[in-house]
Amino acid sequence: ENFNDPKNIFNTLMEYKKILLNENHKMNLIGKSTIDDFDQRHIIDCIQIIKHMPDKKKQVMDIGTGAGLPGVLLSILGYQNLHLVEKSPKKSAFLETCKAHLGLNYKIHTKPIAEISGVNIDYITARAFAPIEKIITATKKIIHKKTIYVLLKGKSYLSELNLINPQKYSWKNYPSITSEESKIIVLGIK
């Protein structure tokens, strides 16, 4: 399938949305209050990170994928070496359903992030998962000197960044296009 064709991408995104909303009542993948504003709150919010991840061939890991946000969306947008980490077997089964129905290509890890090793990840993404410091600690076994964290963060981002050692890490925060109090934190190892 041609993931560079905007019409194909759009149709696949809408098909994903349909699957997610259909399954949502069974396992609460997204908050009910966010359903009416799904495209803005979830799709646009997640895909705004791709400008910080220009190389779609690199190894990408989305931790705490849950409903597939942003992991499944990154796959729809053509990222080729994706690892989705979701310790809940129910949610992993949902990610498997999306993969099969939408013809996507990603590896699902149904275990806590700290238990994963043997991969060298270039980009790490997370949305509504854990404080930045916990994400860094949990991913120690899978990173290298050039790994970049691209994290979608809410209003607590500043207090989270205050706990990060500026001698070891450098970061920039970018405004979110979907929420004034949210940021995209792009963090690298010094």
Model-predicted regions and their roles:
Residues 83, 156-190:
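Active-site capping/gating segments
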Residues 47-122, 126:
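Conserved SAM/SAH cofactor-binding pocket of Class I
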Residues 91-93, 132, 157:
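Short alpha-helix immediately C-terminal to the canonical SAM-binding loop
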Residues 126-133, 140:
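Alpha-helical transmembrane segments of helical membrane proteins, especially in multi-pass transport
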Residues 146-157:
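Conserved beta-strand signature within the Rossmann-like core of class I S-adenosyl-L-methionine
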Residues 136-148:
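A short glycine-rich, Lys/Arg-flanked "PGG" loop and its adjoining helix->strand segment in the class I
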Residues 81, 105-107, 148, 167-170:
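Conserved beta-strand segments of alpha/beta enzyme cores
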Residues 2-56, 61, 90-104:
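Class I SAM-dependent transferase core
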